[in-house]
């Protein structure tokens, strides 16, 4: 009398009328409630088809093995043998699993190495392809038949115009629509933007002091000439007299990579967060576009040689698809970033002054340039026409910065900083932080438009006010390089720190002591 489900002697046996099978009542009831079928034959079955089996009420006898001591010892011996066999089987399974895991880990390591190699080969192939794409048009133009002019000379009519200048494709209507749409969107967003509550307060900035110093450039050619901060990754890029650009991770205090390729000092550089690109301009008359890889390295994908003199400034448009370079050859170039092509090169026939600084307006339709002749020029990007000129500086305009409020422009020169109201096209304030022999080398608004940083013989931070109110000095940070020449000043996110570059090789971070615990172990260096 064995239950057809459990294989045990049932305590409350029942029989199916249809199949005649014996079941434990509680088991078959539960199965019928869930499925409505016989658990063995799968026929339709209800509780009405189940008949209870009447048995005698007797005491269940004890098993013979448990009725004596020898029987109990035999049972224990059998149980022990079963446990030993099970343990042996488990040890064998564990050994097999360890072997399989070791094999899988070796396979994973080999796969990772192969993937890394393939990625490296892919990046190299991309760089070669981009270089080939730039070389093919030039080679095709060189191989194309040329027209013979009356004096017997040959000219490339598709590249050079009658005036001897290269013919550029220009900014087409589609690009103009894109620039206009970007301007409309950013302008509307800027008007709604409020000062973030996380912005560093005046009291906090008054307590700023040097929290770290990092030797990034060579000792035999010291000097940081340009600087930029990645808007989302807290990476600081510096360009030096040693011809190198260094990418520095501020939170970890480590150098991510050093970009080499220019033959002279790097005068300007900018991040292009879109597609992890990076642009550098140099005194060697070239501009390089660098492509970042997943491993953190940067490869040069374009080398642009459209200028005939030192490239002094690089500024990236808000769309992150275009950028402008300004040079001492008295021209500025508008580039398409993906193709690395110069869409237009703008120069003025009158005057021989070169450009020393340039910056896009935050909304993107206005470009500001500073010249060696102390003139600030405002350009309409869509038409490439000079729409305004600001005069009054003494010496070359070394730096400029548009405020995020959209209507303040700060420019720096030998005589200090001049503040311009773009709504009325006039100078409403002049800040002269240093004596007449000390030029102002850097000027920078923070992203909120609440503070203005000035770099010269030291670093000074001013509170931004309106046209009528005084712009108060908040903090003076000494130049700890010993050179007496601060060349670059940049605000970190929410003005939580200030990055300063000087004519030594060290990048210095000023902030509130204790706010950046990750930088506490960094050793200051005054070499």
Curated annotation (Swiss-Prot):
Residues 107-141 form a coiled coil. GO terms for cellular component: cytoplasm; nucleus; Prp19 complex; U2-type catalytic step 1 spliceosome. The keyword DNA repair applies. Gene3D superfamilies: YVTN repeat-like/Quinoprotein amine dehydrogenase, Zinc/RING finger domain, C3HC4 (zinc finger). GO terms for biological process: DNA repair; innate immune response; mRNA splicing, via spliceosome; protein K63-linked ubiquitination; protein ubiquitination. Keywords: Coiled coil, DNA damage, DNA repair, Immunity, Innate immunity, mRNA processing, mRNA splicing, Nucleus, Plant defense, Repeat, Spliceosome, Transferase, Ubl conjugation pathway, WD repeat. It comes from the Eukaryota. Its EC number is 2.3.2.27. Pfam families: Prp19 (PF08606), WD40_Prp19 (PF24814). Homotetramer. Component of the multiprotein assembly MOS4-associated complex (MAC) at least composed of MOS4, CDC5, PRL1 and PRP19 which is related to the PRP19C/Prp19 complex/NTC/Nineteen complex identified in other organisms. Associated with the spliceosome. Belongs to the WD repeat PRP19 family. Probable ubiquitin-protein ligase which is mainly involved pre-mRNA splicing and DNA repair. This is Pre-mRNA-processing factor 19.
């Amino acid at each position: 009398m064995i239950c057809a489900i459990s294989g045990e002697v049932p305590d409350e046996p029942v029989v199916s009328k249809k199949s005649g099978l014996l079941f434990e009542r509680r088991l078959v009831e539960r199965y019928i409630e869930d499925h409505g079928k016989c658990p063995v034959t799968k026929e339709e079955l209800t509780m009405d088809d189940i008949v209870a089996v009447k048995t005698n009420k007797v005491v269940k006898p004890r098993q013979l093995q448990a009725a004596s001591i020898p029987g109990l010892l035999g049972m224990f011996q059998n149980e022990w043998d079963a446990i030993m066999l099970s343990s042996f089987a488990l040890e064998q399974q564990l050994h097999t699993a360890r072997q399989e895991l070791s094999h899988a880990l070796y396979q994973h390591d080999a796969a990772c190495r192969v993937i890394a190699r393939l990625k490296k080969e892919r990046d190299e192939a991309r760089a070669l392809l981009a270089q080939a794409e730039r070389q093919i048009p030039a080679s095709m133009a060189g191989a194309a038949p040329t027209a013979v002019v009356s004096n017997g000379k040959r000219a490339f009519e598709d590249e050079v115009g009658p005036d001897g200048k290269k013919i550029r494709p220009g900014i087409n209507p589609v690009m103009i629509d894109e620039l206009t749409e970007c301007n409309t969107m950013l302008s509307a967003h800027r008007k709604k933007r409020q000062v973030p509550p996380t912005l560093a307060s005046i009291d906090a900035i008054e307590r700023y002091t040097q929290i770290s110093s990092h030797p990034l450039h060579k000792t035999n050619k010291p000097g940081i000439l340009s600087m930029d901060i990645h808007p989302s990754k807290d990476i600081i890029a510096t360009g030096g007299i040693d011809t190198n650009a260094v990418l520095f991770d501020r939170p970890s205090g480590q150098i991510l990579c050093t970009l080499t390729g220019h033959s002279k000092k790097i005068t300007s550089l900018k991040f292009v967060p879109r597609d992890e690109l990076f642009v550098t301009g140099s005194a060697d008359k070239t501009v390089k576009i660098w492509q970042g890889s997943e491993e953190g390295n940067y490869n040069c994908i374009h080398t642009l040689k459209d200028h005939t003199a030192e490239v002094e400034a690089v500024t990236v448009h808000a769309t992150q698809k275009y950028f402008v370079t300004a040079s001492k050859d008295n021209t500025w170039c508008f580039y398409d970033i993906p193709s690395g092509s110069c869409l237009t090169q703008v120069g003025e026939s009158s005057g021989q002054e070169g450009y020393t600084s340039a910056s896009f307006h935050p909304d993107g339709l206005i470009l500001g340039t500073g010249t060696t002749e102390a003139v600030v020029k405002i350009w309409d990007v869509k038409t490439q026409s000079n729409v305004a000129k600001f005069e009054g500086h003494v010496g070359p305009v070394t730096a400029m910065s548009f405020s995020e409020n959209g209507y303040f422009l700060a420019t720096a020169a030998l005589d200090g900083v001049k503040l311009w109201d773009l709504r009325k096209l006039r100078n409403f304030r002049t800040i002269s932080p240093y004596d007449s022999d000390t030029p102002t080398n850097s000027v920078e608004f923070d992203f909120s438009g609440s503070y203005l940083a000035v770099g010269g013989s030291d670093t000074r931070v001013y509170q931004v006010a309106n046209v009528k109110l005084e712009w108060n000095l908040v903090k003076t940070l000494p130049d700890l390089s010993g050179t007496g020449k601060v060349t670059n000043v940049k605000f970190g996110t929410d003005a939580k720190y200030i990055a300063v570059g000087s004519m030594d090789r060290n990048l210095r971070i000023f902030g509130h002591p204790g706010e950046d615990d990750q930088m506490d172990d960094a050793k200051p260096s005054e070499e």
